[in-house]
């Protein structure tokens, strides 16, 4: 008996998709090894390492919702000595996973093969995804969870779908989990919840209730740690982001970075680093055309009740994602994370017609190149020199640990660059868990709050270190001058180390300066 051609074709399609995913994962792993170090990585690497000894908020400061360090905590033991590169590798795989989940969501939503591929490649080539998957920040995990939640929620819209209640529960868990990993994903999660409530008669009470229960479970990590240390959690999740970036920019005469005109330009620029801007314009044009001629839809845009419901859901998610991207100041590319999945999914569903025109295909290809360009430029030099910044930092961290242990120095290591010290085997002073971010604040915390939140701002440095002299101080990565720190943020640490007779050693792989406590 000959086999049916359909299963054979289906298997071939899945094998092809798996091959593309493996290639993408390999490229993202390569990028993670050769991308330069971003100082934002410090607090996320430190938080995972400090999970060996405590919990976010209660035992060390953390400036986001807490799912990522909780979920990745086992790596602090499994990858000891290699934690920084391991966290980058995990993010690379999560980034590739987000692309796979978006492709699955597009296929489930009824996109053609080309439309689903377009949605996936648009996300994969966006600067936002490439940045999230190349560094050890907290952008890849919530993006993956959000794309997974979107894929899981789509069957709930189908009256004939199996296991709708289970799918709704898992969707709520994933979407709320994304918000528990990064607070800005709370807006799209809330948008899905609002959509479900507005369509409760169509979706049914069971799936809507399951979605809500899943959402509550996904939020449990945040609720739990908030209950353990409510003031510190509120500060880390809400207050810091509402106060500290504004204070820093104002003190340094950079108020224009916070203003709406420049914020709009920055948002458009980041959307243009990939297919975001093209997708937004295409969706806008399609909406205007559908309103002008609602009864003359082409075959590729078949108008069905399910398609209309999907469109309403995605448009609501796009709106929520745009608000989530707009609210933080200054705007950076990673803030597009809550916006891009729904945007590219909708783009894949409606782009079949526009893609028949050669100039549209050329524009999409150009947008994809624009998204890849910055990452390509950033890693090209390191690839040519065969220099991996993350491995160089790990080598220096290990050398620092050897030097500190050779002096039998007790105590912790102090640094504004925790990602460069975490693999030394020497405990990090938890007051520096956020790297430079709480250190550089002026009036964001009172002295009592800084003590309660396990932080040590610059103006309290002398008193704080005098009371607990560190085994070593690692500097050299925060030398950029600013108005309130003309010699760089590392300068107060260097000054304190010199006054107390610490011996300087230059680490060979990165040129960082390690100050060792004098023998007693």
Task: Describe the residue ranges of each PLM region.
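Transmembrane-helix motifs of polytopic, lipid-linked glycan transferases
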Residues: 89-110, 125, 148
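Hydrophobic, aromatic-rich transmembrane alpha-helices
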Residues: 100, 266-308, 315-322
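Membrane-interface transmembrane helices that cradle and orient dolichyl/undecaprenyl
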Residues: 107-110, 149-170, 197-200, 277-293, ...
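Membrane-interface alpha helices of multi-pass inner-membrane proteins
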Residues: 119-120, 165-183, 188-195, 215-216, ...
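Hydrophobic/aromatic-rich transmembrane helices and adjacent perimembrane loops
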Residues: 132, 139-142, 187, 322-359
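Perimembrane helix-loop-helix junctions
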Residues: 158-159, 188-219, 286-300, 345, ...
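Short periplasmic/luminal acceptor-recognition loop of GT-C membrane glycosyltransferases, typified by
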Residues: 190, 274-276, 390, 394-444, ...
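Membrane-lumen/periplasm interface segments of specific transmembrane helices
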Residues: 208-250, 323, 327, 334
């Amino acid at each position: 008996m000959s086999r049916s051609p359909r299963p054979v074709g289906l298997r071939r399609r899945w094998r092809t998709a798996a091959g593309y995913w493996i290639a993408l994962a390999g490229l993202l792993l390569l990028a993670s090894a050769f991308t330069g170090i971003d100082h934002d990585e410090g607090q996320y690497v430190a938080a995972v390492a400090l999970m060996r000894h405590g919990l976010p908020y209660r035992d060390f400061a953390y400036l986001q919702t807490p799912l990522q360090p909780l979920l990745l905590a086992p790596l602090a033991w499994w990858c000891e000595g290699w934690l920084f590169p391991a966290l980058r590798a995990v993010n690379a795989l999560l980034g590739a996973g987000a692309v796979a989940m978006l492709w699955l969501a597009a296929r489930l939503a009824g996109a053609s093969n080309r439309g689903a591929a377009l949605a996936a490649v648009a996300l994969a080539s966006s600067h936002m995804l490439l940045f999230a998957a190349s560094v050890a920040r907290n952008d890849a995990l919530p993006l993956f969870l959000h794309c997974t939640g979107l894929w899981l929620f789509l069957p709930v819209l189908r009256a004939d779908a199996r296991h709708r209640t289970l799918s709704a529960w898992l969707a709520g868990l994933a979407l709320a989990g994304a918000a528990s990993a990064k607070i800005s994903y709370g807006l799209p999660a809330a948008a899905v919840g609002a959509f479900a409530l507005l369509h409760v008669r169509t979706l049914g009470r069971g799936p809507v209730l399951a979605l809500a229960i899943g959402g509550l479970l996904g939020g449990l990590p945040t609720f739990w740690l908030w209950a353990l240390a409510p003031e510190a959690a509120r500060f880390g999740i809400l207050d810091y982001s509402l106060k500290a970036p504004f204070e820093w920019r104002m003190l340094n005469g950079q108020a224009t970075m916070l203003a709406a005109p420049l914020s709009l330009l920055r948002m458009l620029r980041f959307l243009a680093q990939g297919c975001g801007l093209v997708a937004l314009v295409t969706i806008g044009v399609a909406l205007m055309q559908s309103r002008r001629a609602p009864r003359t839809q082409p075959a590729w845009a078949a108008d069905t009740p399910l398609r209309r419901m999907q469109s309403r859901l995605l448009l609501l998610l796009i709106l929520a994602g745009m608000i989530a991207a707009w609210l933080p100041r200054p705007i950076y590319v990673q803030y597009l994370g809550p916006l891009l999945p729904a945007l590219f999914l909708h783009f894949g569903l409606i782009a079949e017609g526009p893609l028949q025109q050669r100039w549209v295909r050329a524009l999409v290809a150009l947008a994809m190149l624009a998204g890849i360009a910055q990452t390509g430029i950033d890693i090209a030099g390191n690839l040519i020199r065969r220099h991996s910044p993350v491995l160089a930092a790990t080598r220096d961290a290990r050398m620092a640990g050897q030097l500190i242990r050779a002096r039998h120095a007790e105590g912790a290591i102090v640094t504004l660059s925790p990602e460069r010290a975490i693999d030394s085997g020497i405990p990090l002073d938890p007051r520096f868990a956020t790297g430079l971010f709480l250190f550089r604040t002026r009036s964001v915390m009172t002295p009592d709050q800084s003590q309660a939140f396990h932080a040590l701002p610059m103006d309290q440095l002398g008193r704080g270190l005098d009371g607990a002299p560190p085994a070593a101080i690692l500097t050299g990565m925060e030398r950029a001058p600013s108005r309130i720190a003309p010699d760089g943020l590392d300068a107060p640490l260097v000054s304190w180390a010199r006054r107390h007779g610490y011996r300087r050693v230059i680490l060979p792989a990165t040129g960082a300066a390690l100050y060792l406590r004098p023998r007693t």
